[in-house]
From Swiss-Prot:
One of its GO terms (cellular component) is extracellular region. The modification Cysteine amide is found at C11. Its main location: secreted. The keyword Disulfide bond applies. This is Conotoxin Ama1245. Probable toxin that inhibits ion channels. Keywords: Amidation, Disulfide bond, Hydroxylation, Ion channel impairing toxin, Secreted, Toxin. Contains 2 disulfide bonds. One of its GO terms (molecular function) is toxin activity. The modification 4-hydroxyproline is found at P10. It is found in: Secreted. Expressed by the venom duct. It comes from Conus amadis. The lineage of its organism: Eukaryota, Metazoa, Spiralia, Lophotrochozoa, Mollusca.
Length: 11
C-alpha cells in the first residue's frame, strides 16, 4: 500500500 489523499490511507 502507499499513502494516498491528505490522510495516509491505502490506495
Amino acid at each position: 500500500s502507499q499513502c494516498c489523499y491528505q490522510i495516509c490511507s491505502p490506495c
